[in-house]
């Protein structure tokens, strides 16, 4: 029965190692501990090429007895010399500092402080105007003066007047657009609340303007106003309360409605404040942009319908039925709502053709003036007649003081059950309101050329302004992008200008809403039309060609639902559709990043030539499946189908799969459905006798813990092996193939009469019995065929190696390493042997560090060394087994070592140092031939190594 566990195989290969000496900490740590065993197996498999009985010691300096070496456990060499007692041709190696006991941070050295006194230093990010400890808490009048006047003095009052006029005009226009329709004035119950809506709007503007201008906002000239997108939610709240309370109790309806408005502002402010305090400003950016566009489109359609209602002066709201449509197309009514629609469309076209910031304000200043000139010029036309016919607002609607809306509050008349029924609308209003700050703040910063703005600070400012606004009986507000940009560019980029604008707005509030009685209805309708058209254009026209078809369909669905059904329902449907389409899109992208053959992608272990030749042929039995992204029910089924298809395809091609490696290094997480899928995959592979190896699992993640425990851990794991990285997985699979190859190779060489050539006697007794138990199968037939092909190529050189065995080292070693690739005869290499010196390395001994001057190259006779390549962000290690050369490219090219090399096991090595190399060239009359041959061999070996690293990096690390 084959051994599936690496610890079980280790007990057969190395009986002297106690598997229970290391305490278990977790399943993954147990599997990672097998990595050292994999390296031992790589070294043992490579050491097959060295026969201690036929390859005697090299020189009288090192009278090494071969019997001192225990080849069953390479880590237990008995050496005659330590490196501390070598001759001048040997090198002093220091114990490696790269081990488990080395601290991550060096010990802090004590130095005398040479720094100047702390009070004379300016610390980073420390304000130059920060008060000293003695003056902390005092209010400096000079700083207040600097805060408001910016070193310009009292003349700043005069300089700010144009900007204040522009800001005040914008507030008036917004009041007519937003404030006048704060309540659904088309309904008879709310018909007379237009003036109160204006007053509430102005109070909200004043509160937000004071908060921003007194230091709440980073922008000195920011302008606060009501958010037009909240109007539909306010109307929804009003109608919800009206339906719950009934039309027969108007006082309770109005009291409950206005209280709900204030509570929604407080709720919005608290959410803003909490997000800012917790520094979660970027959290809002994760909300899908196309859902926001759909909501904006829904608001735009609502504003268009509201403009029709306000302009037509019909009782009730516009409905999609025959009675409402027939009333709208009465001649006089049609003229009332079609004229502002035509003007707003023409104004939108003009704005696209001539995008000047003062175009719209100028129109709404000049157009009413022209209107009144025409009224005065037309005989028989009077203002009272226009009010009676609905062309100008009635004076009865505005004959109230500005503070009248406070009289509408009444806790006694408030219907608390109806108020609770509006909580969903409040939450939707809050949710929609907080989406605009992370959009407007960066947009304004870019327009003003500012590099950095603290969004969290702006959220806190919005939290304060909205909470205060709700506390004083007003509604939501935010920093408007358009108004702020026009105000700043008009010269209002200072905090004094914001204070002056707030005071001017207070004056406008105190004057009262009587001015409304002189405003044409079509002016307000044109404003509302213009806003609605712009929002519809932003949501339905601008995304064409930018968004995907699915996203655009979602936008249209949200707009339609908000227009026909309900605003809250529209938002919910949009979120549901976004989630569904996200699952569909995520499922369409395969989580399987790629499938790579082990014949192309190899581990970074440097092995002898014949083993590399064998792995190039048999490596197809190893397949690496690299996964990426988040694994969930939508993607894991595709992975399962691909794995089943891969196995079937390889079986049909007479190249059956033996090892499947699944790499999780690029996987972010997994849900529970993935666990069930991998249980099925594991059972399928076990049925087909395919070894499953997984790597890259992050034990710190809860989803991976569940996956590891249920699928790859426990006693019933179907022989699954877990490794730290894909390199260790590949090394393990290659070692298993090489271990079987070693068995076939020994038997084939024995039949061919080479039983004592290069094999170690008595080493494979256990393995032969294990190999003989293999049942005939296509994968083992392929293994035998490749082994026979490799051994056939190898036997061509075996007769030479038998001849070389009678020579002293390092000549046999040099011929084994370079014999297959060199173009020179034996006498060439015999002449080089005296310049190589033998040395012994203990485990952990340091050969050289990265960046050191290249002073030697090393040929491994036994054991293994590890080369660590450390880049800026990534690191890669290469295990180098015996019969391999180390450091040849830096040595001959005279460039610094590019890796740190440490003895991974006790090793016997042959060293050619710089002094020996130069002596070799000086003492030979064929120095140029020697140099060219060594450079040729170096380039050839580097090419093979480069191919391995390139395939590994491009396929598995991309």
From Swiss-Prot:
Gene Ontology molecular-function annotations: basic amino acid transmembrane transporter activity
Membrane topology of this protein: Multi-pass membrane protein
Record flagged with keyword Transmembrane: yes
Keyword terms: Amino-acid transport, Membrane, Transmembrane, Transmembrane helix, Transport, Vacuole
Pfam families referenced in this protein's UniProt entry, alphabetically: cNMP_binding, STAS, Sulfate_transp
Cell location: Vacuole membrane
Effect of residue 174 to A: Disrupts activity
Domain STAS: 612-733
Superkingdom to which the source organism belongs: Eukaryota
Result of knocking out the encoding gene: Decreases cellular and vacuolar levels of basic amino acids (arginine, histidine and lysine). Small vacuoles.
Gene Ontology CC annotation, any one: plasma membrane
Record-linked InterPro entries: cNMP-bd_dom, cNMP-bd_dom_sf, Membrane-Transporter-like, RmlC-like_jellyroll, SLC26A/SulP_dom, STAS_dom, STAS_dom_sf
Primary location recorded for the protein, binned into one broad class: membrane
Parts of the chain that traverse the membrane: 153-173, 199-219, 258-278, 291-311, 327-347, 358-378, 426-446, 499-519, 521-541, 543-563, 564-584, 627-647, 659-679
Gene Ontology biological process terms in this record: basic amino acid transmembrane import into vacuole
Functional note: Amino acid transporter involved in vacuolar uptake of basic amino acids for storage.
PANTHER family the record matches: AFR304WP (PTHR43310:SF4), SULFATE TRANSPORTER YBAR-RELATED (PTHR43310)
Additional note from the record: C-terminal GFP or HA(3) tagging interferes with activity.
Stated name of the protein: Vacuolar basic amino acid transporter vsb1
Organism: Schizosaccharomyces pombe (strain 972 / ATCC 24843)
Lineage of producing organism: Eukaryota, Fungi, Dikarya, Ascomycota, Taphrinomycotina
Gene: vsb1
